[in-house]
Amino acid sequence: MINIMEVTETNKMVEKENLDVRTITMGINLLDCAGPDLAEVNEKIYNKITTLAKDLVSTGEEIAKEFGVPIVNKRISITPISLVGSSACKTPEDYVTIAKTLDKAAHTVGVNFIGGYSAVVSKGMTKSDELLIRSIPQALAQTELICSSVNVGSTKTGINMDAVRLMGEIVKETAELTKDKDSLGCAKLVVLCNAPDDNPFMAGAFHGVTEDDAIINVGVSGPGVVKYALESVRGKSFEVLCETIKKTAFKITRVGQLVAQEASKRLGVPFGIIDLSLAPTPAVGDSVAEILEEIGLERAGAPGTTAALAMLNDQVKKGGVMASSYVGGLSGAFIPVSEDQGMIDAVNEGSLTIEKLEAMTCVCSVGLDMIAIPGDTPATTISGIIADEAAIGMVNQKTTAVRVIPVVGKGVGETVEFGGLLGYAPIMPVNKFDCSAFVNRVGRIPAPIHSFKN
């Protein structure tokens, strides 16, 4: 039974503690738009998206107004475009025409982003996969709202090192083609291992082939709420700490469940999942790093950080699972550097390095996220970073990802400003030693022994 105290508590979460629904994401299947004629494919894609998602933004705004809960983003995820364009696209430029169509459709319906300019190449690359991947730099340079992702490995298949090597080059090329905007294109490009089919968060969202024709997935955000709750239990035992996080996560997720069901009902689209992720913003008091400091660390990155993050992640899941009928996506704590003021402060004070962030990715939601690195970082070094993250995901049976921005013309000690939810970031140093002889081997890294479950 809900009592009046809980109602006022939820109001306080929204008013003072930065509780919001980070995104309502509509997943749309575009496989029925495939065909041999490129102009026809583009027309079908545009028509399907603008028909199914025409009321997405207005519905989100109505729900936000009625329930008093801010809904920050309305987004679309689509079937990986390497599949949709495989018959019609013969060159990377052909795929870029689809990117422009998607961008136009996204502008027409008014969403913040559209994700799914993607390829799933966990074991091998088809010709169309490779064409799409090679088109990514142009696509991101010539569009505004497109997000791109490439899945290069999984626990079941191992790591496709040919794709990893290629993605290092693609990240560099994307940085170069968007250098007039501080290499912003790379902020909309993520390389994943074990990518989920139902992720509502960008840039890794795509509508997997296992999904319904259309679906509503919701991502909730509440680092500020968790931090405020923990302020009242300073110095208490781990048991009290864990219970507090769990109860808070339950309340946050309940808000997401309410919004998801309402959006599903009004749009006439089935409800998919709630993503339990704690997603920070650059706003002060809306930071995962500040939660870790409230738990007892002087700064994020201090000894004990990985343990504190593991505990936070686990309790968020335990609390959230009870509050929703379906949980999915990434569901954990995000640790993006540029989007989290506490992380930025930790980097500036020398407490947090890329190596420590990599350790933290073993126990949190995704991976090395929104990290600005020197523009002269070699492509093979970026591939090495991607391979390391993919290995963590593959062996630990979890989603991992890399979204690094090699900012052209900038080096360690400088800062890059992305604006909005993407925030700003200090350029972080990268290990200078070479890994090209490793990265340039062809083939794939086999799946781990514990992946054989049959």
From Swiss-Prot:
Q: Which family does it belong to?
A: Belongs to the UPF0210 family.
For this protein, the record's NCBIfam families field holds: PRK05313.1
Please give the SUPFAM superfamilies that the UniProt record associates with this protein: PFL-like glycyl radical enzymes
Q: Please report the name of this protein according to its UniProt entry.
A: UPF0210 protein EUBELI_01067
Q: Which domain of life is it from?
A: Bacteria
Native organism: Lachnospira eligens (strain ATCC 27750 / DSM 3376 / VPI C15-48 / C15-B4)
Q: Subunit arrangement? A: Homodimer.
Give the residues annotated as coiled coil: none
